[in-house]
C-alpha cells in the first residue's frame, strides 16, 4: 500500500507506517506543496496524510485513482471537498481535539504578552536601552478583575476561558448556543455579539 505524506510531520508517523510494510513517501521541501506536485504524488497513492494548507478539490480528487483515505493532519477539513471525496469512495479523517490545549495556551500567552508589554520589554533589551528597573517602566495591565471576552464557546474557547479564569478575570462569551460546561467551570456569562 502506497502512502503519500504532503509535508514532513513527526517521524513516528512514517516509522509506524513502514513497520506495517507500507510504502511511504514524503514531500520534503520546506514549503507547501504546489498543486502540480500534489497531482504528481497522489495519482497512485492508496492513502494520503495531508495538511490544512493542502487543497483537495475535485480536480485533485479526480487524479486520486487508488486512494481510499485522506487523513488530514488538522483539526478541521475545510481544505477538502468532503462531499466529492465521499462520491469517489474516499474516507476523510481529521484530528479534532489535538490542538485545543496548545491553541488555548497560545491565546493566553498572547494576552499576557499584550497586557504586560512583553514585546516592548524584549525590544528594550535587544536595543540595549534597558538601564535598570523603574517603578512605571513597562508596567502594563493586570488581568485580575478584568473582563475577558471569548468569541466562540467550543473546545478552544472553553479551554481558553478556564485558563483566563485562573488570573482572576470575569468571563463573558458569545456563541450560537449556551455552553453550560463553560459557565459551570468559570462562572462565564453569555452575552450578545454586540455586547462582547
Predicted regions: what they are:
Residues 40-42, 108-111, 186-189:
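Short low-complexity, flexible loop/linker segments enriched in glycine and/or proline
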Residues 91-97, 191-193:
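Short beta-strand elements at the ligand-binding edges of bilobed clamshell
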Residues 1-93:
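An N-terminal-biased, well-structured beta-alpha scaffold segment characteristic
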Residues 43, 62-65, 116, 141, ...:
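Structured loop/turn residues at beta-strand edges in well-structured enzyme cores
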Residues 23, 91, 113, 170, ...:
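Residue-level detector of anion-binding/catalytic polar loops
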Residues 96-147, 162, 173-176:
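Phosphate-binding beta-alpha-beta segment of Rossmann-like dinucleotide-binding domains, i.e.
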Residues 28-32, 51-52, 127-136, 184-190:
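Short gly/ser/thr-rich secondary-structure transition/capping motifs
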Amino acid at each position: 500500500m502506497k502512502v503519500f505524506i504532503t509535508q514532513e510531520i513527526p517521524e513516528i508517523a512514517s516509522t509506524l507506517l513502514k513497520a506495517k510494510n507500507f510504502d511511504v513517501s514524503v514531500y520534503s521541501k520546506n514549503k507547501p506543496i504546489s498543486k502540480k506536485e500534489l497531482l504528481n504524488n497522489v495519482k497512485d497513492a492508496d492513502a494520503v496524510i495531508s495538511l490544512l494548507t493542502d487543497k483537495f478539490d475535485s480536480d485533485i480528487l479526480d487524479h486520486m485513482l487508488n486512494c481510499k483515505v485522506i487523513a488530514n493532519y488538522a483539526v478541521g477539513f475545510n481544505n477538502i471537498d468532503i462531499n466529492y471525496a465521499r462520491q469517489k469512495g474516499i474516507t476523510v479523517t481529521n484530528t479534532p481535539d489535538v490542538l485545543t490545549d496548545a491553541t488555548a495556551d497560545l491565546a493566553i500567552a498572547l494576552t499576557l504578552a499584550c497586557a504586560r508589554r512583553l514585546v516592548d520589554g524584549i525590544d528594550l533589551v535587544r536595543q540595549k536601552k534597558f538601564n535598570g528597573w523603574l517603578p512605571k517602566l513597562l508596567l502594563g495591565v493586570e488581568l485580575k478583575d478584568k473582563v475577558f471576552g471569548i468569541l466562540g464557546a467550543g473546545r478552544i474557547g472553553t479551554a481558553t476561558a478556564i485558563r483566563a479564569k485562573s488570573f482572576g478575570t470575569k468571563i463573558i462569551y458569545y456563541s450560537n448556543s449556551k455552553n453550560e460546561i463553560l459557565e459551570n467551570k468559570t462562572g462565564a456569562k453569555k452575552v450578545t455579539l454586540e455586547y462582547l
